[in-house]
């Protein structure tokens, strides 16, 4: 087996010398490329594109983070994930009473991750929501070119859906060089 690097489709268009969007591709004994693993595809920096929440009991969708959320998730080759997402139209708190509202448009944690099948599983070590610390959480992910679509399991989120079961549908775009 050999190890080569291959860029995702369209990832290096116009940036032939870039290595920001490459992931390892192993070759079989006959020299044919094998598909990259999900972990190979995840490693790197991803920008938040959209964050929608589906309520289980009603089937309605909430644009929980607003029309133009921002944030990043970073996966390292050695198994760390850092996740920081913010909703649209956030402004600095002017009073103590403003802080709880800001927490409703924030998701942030750091931990170790591993990949099993089509899921990444993280052991949360620090988080914006203390009840997440020490938990193991699963996310289903589909990577297509430079886009990653993530679906959470049904659960009760601390910051929306008023304690009802919901799941998040999150889209990321692989970050460009220097982004």
Give, region by region, the residue ranges found by the protein language model.
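N-terminal amphipathic/basic-hydrophobic helices that include classical n-h-c signal peptides
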Residues: 1-29
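Lipid interaction determinants
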Residues: 23-110, 115-179
């Amino acid at each position: 087996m050999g190890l080569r690097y291959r860029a995702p489709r369209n990832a290096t268009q116009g940036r032939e010398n870039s290595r920001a969007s490459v992931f390892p591709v192993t070759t079989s004994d006959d020299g044919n490329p094998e598909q990259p693993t999900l972990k190979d595809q995840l490693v790197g920096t991803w920008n938040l594109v959209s964050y929608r929440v589906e309520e289980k009991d009603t089937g309605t969708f909430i644009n929980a983070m607003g029309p133009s959320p921002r944030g990043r998730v970073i996966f390292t080759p050695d198994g760390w994930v850092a996740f920081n997402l913010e909703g649209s139209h956030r402004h600095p708190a002017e009073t103590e009473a403003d802080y709880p509202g800001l927490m409703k448009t924030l998701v942030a944690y750091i931990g170790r991750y591993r990949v099993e099948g089509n899921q990444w599983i993280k052991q949360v070590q620090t988080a914006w929501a203390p009840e997440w610390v020490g938990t193991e959480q699963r996310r289903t992910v589909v990577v297509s070119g430079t886009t990653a679509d993530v679906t959470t399991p049904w659960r009760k989120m601390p910051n929306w859906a008023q304690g009802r079961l919901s799941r998040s549908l999150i889209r990321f775009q692989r970050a460009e060089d220097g982004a």
